């Protein structure tokens, strides 16, 4: 009874219950007052088994490895800004985060049965999985490779040839020759190919295209002439109809 009023039992209870057991802690604490030191709840209990000590040591080691891995990641991110070095450092950091057996969910639930123990590593045990799931989102490779089959294909899946461009001098000489002859002989084609630094095939294709262009021009001129004739015929018919109407409206006496 006298222990409740002693100085060591009222104000000096902290020094007493640290060295003693659970009974001394309760005996040195007044029932009518609230204790103002919450860290006393985290004191090890006397009935803890050696397995609890090994679990705490393993989780402490795991937390230390996580801090070391985070330091490596921050260091690599500061040195290299292009992203590839950070990715390698991130992978090496994940390799170091090997989850011990004590940090499994089963061990966490079994250890949480004691209400007086705190588990500060509960969130850290779930870090590697979340980081691994977020890694492919942050480092998605961009596919900008160009392959030959991506070019514009021609007939039968073959690659289309580029369009030949002619200089003004070459075009002028070809137009002058086409104005004289629409069809070239083999000898004349060879002479023009040597004179204009072109191949016989290019000369032949140019003349074919030029003849087709001339044919379209002639066809367009014919269509214009036909439209002109039709327009003149309609005008003549309209004029004749107007004259006939005028003649019917004013008969001759």
UniProtKB/Swiss-Prot annotation:
Tissue: In the embryo (at 20% embryogenesis), expression is highest in the first abdominal segment (A1) with significant but diminishing levels in more posterior thoracic segments (T1 and T3).
One Pfam short name: Homeodomain
Locations listed in the record: Nucleus
Chief location bin: nucleus
Gene3D superfamilies according to UniProt: Homeodomain-like (1.10.10.60)
Source organism, top-level taxon: Eukaryota
Motif QA positions after renumbering to this chain: 232-247
Gene Ontology MF terms: DNA-binding transcription factor activity; DNA-binding transcription factor activity, RNA polymerase II-specific; RNA polymerase II cis-regulatory region sequence-specific DNA binding
DNA-binding segment(s): 159-218
Biological process according to GO: anterior/posterior pattern specification; negative regulation of transcription by RNA polymerase II; regulation of DNA-templated transcription
Chain positions of motif Antp-type hexapeptide: 146-151
UniProt family annotation: Belongs to the Antp homeobox family.
Domain remark from Swiss-Prot or TrEMBL: The QA motif is able to mediate transcriptional repression.
Annotated protein name in UniProt: Homeotic protein ultrabithorax
